[in-house]
Amino acid sequence: MAILAGIIAYAASTFLVTGPARPGWLDSWFYIALELGAATVVTARVVLRPIERTAWGSIAGALYAVSLSDAAGAAAAATDRPAADVLDMLAFAFDAAFFGLAFAGLVLLVRKRLPPSTASVWLDGVIASLGMLSIASALFYRAADAITVASLLFLVYAVAPLVLVAILVGTAAALGRRPSEIWVLCTSAFSLMAVGNLIQATGLPWAVQPGSPVDTLWPLAALLLVAAAWRSRSTPRPVGSGSSVVLAIPSVFTLGALAVALVNQFTSLSYFSIGTAVVTVMAGALRLLFAVRDADRLRVRQVELNVSLGLARDAA
């Protein structure tokens, strides 16, 4: 409750206390304290509950990495060069650690929720993941005519949360059923992180200045991960009933990737958007071949069943 109250207070301050009158500690140490608080609550869950301990421990480590990255960034802003450059590199290293730990945690969570499946089911997840990355990157990323270190860092910063969302979207497609409450909470959390990064990546003055409403998204996302961690109480099993909307996800993202390729004929998109669109369409074509194969196998089985029923009727 204390973390929730702190997040509400911080969110209100982004509207009520702006400009030169805004104290610097609100956007540095108070903000970092909110992130550390969320990470600590997830860590407490890891200590107290053995279920999925490694997975949630990785996610707790990811939240700590975000806090340390922001702390290094705040220290860099108050330090002169060359120490500031070292702190900036340290902040980037912690950002990379966040992605690695969050990725590992999600993979561990997803692996226990996906039963042994056919190649078609896994391909549905790949199509949904790559298609979402292609569409989102086409909407938000600038074209990269020349690949530089700065453009690569920009791409990593903007893409990392999207990759985490893509894993969860792909999981929903692979399950082929209505996702669980844990999935909804995790997807909402990483989606908020992705939206925050995408808005800040636009470079709009109101979005990049300290204390903007966008800054509230990351602590709120951390709070959703806290809720997901503590709601996970038993051995995970795929739950829910079949959902035609979820089953249609691969087709929707394949069409979206085709749209990205079409838009590229009229305007220059990033290499990342084009590449993921091409791979998505190729995976969609392969999925169509699998569907034709499965339909043919079903037809053969139906014929064999009819023959068997006819023989049984004649024998009777």
Ranges and model annotations:
Residues 1-316:
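Polytopic alpha-helical membrane-helix bundles and their juxtamembrane interface segments
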